[in-house]
């Protein structure tokens, strides 16, 4: 507080838009998914949630938004650690999984791992296309002035644009 940094950040977001629905998409979804992909291990909850609280979001609203966005990016968080380390290490020596991969026509484990990653990305991208809209609807229903899902849905164009800005590159890279 004494340095005034939070006031500067708050003013910066207000200059972008005073609309909390857009702010939650920018902070929780776009920033949150970015830092999950780069740092992983729940970093969005540790960084984006306090940022939203500092900007004046109710604490519970910030926590709910931070947790909802954790649905899509987690499988490739920390530069793919859950897939590259978790799935690979956890399944590569399992005789049943090796037999299953062979049954599906994969002669190399790495090809099967890529297949798993692609399937996960497709499922998460399909669901992720609607996560920003869900976040805004939940925010306005439980924390908005009118307690209305409809208020959250009014920003659907930006919500879908933001979702696709994350999910399309997500699919391409996966």
Model-derived segments and spans:
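Membrane-embedded alpha-helical segments and adjacent helix-loop junctions characteristic
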Residues: 1-55
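Membrane-core helix-loop-helix motifs of multi-pass transport proteins
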Residues: 55, 61-174
């Amino acid at each position: 507080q004494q340095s005034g940094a939070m006031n500067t950040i708050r003013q910066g977001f207000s200059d972008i838009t005073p609309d909390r629905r857009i702010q939650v998409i920018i902070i929780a979804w776009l920033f949150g998914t970015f830092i999950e992909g780069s740092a992983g291990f729940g970093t969005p909850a540790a960084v984006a949630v306090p940022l939203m609280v500092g900007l004046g979001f109710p604490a519970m609203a910030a926590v709910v938004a931070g947790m909802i966005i954790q649905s899509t990016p987690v499988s490739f968080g920390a530069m793919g650690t859950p897939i590259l380390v978790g799935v690979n290490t956890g399944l590569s020596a399992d005789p049943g999984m090796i037999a299953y991969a062979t049954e599906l026509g994969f002669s190399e484990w790495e090809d099967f791992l890529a297949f798993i990653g692609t399937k996960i990305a497709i499922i998460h991208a399909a669901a992720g296309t609607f996560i920003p809209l869900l976040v805004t609807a939940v925010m306005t229903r439980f924390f908005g002035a009118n307690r209305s899902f409809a208020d959250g849905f009014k920003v659907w164009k930006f919500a879908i644009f933001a979702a696709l800005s994350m999910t399309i590159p997500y699919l391409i890279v996966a």
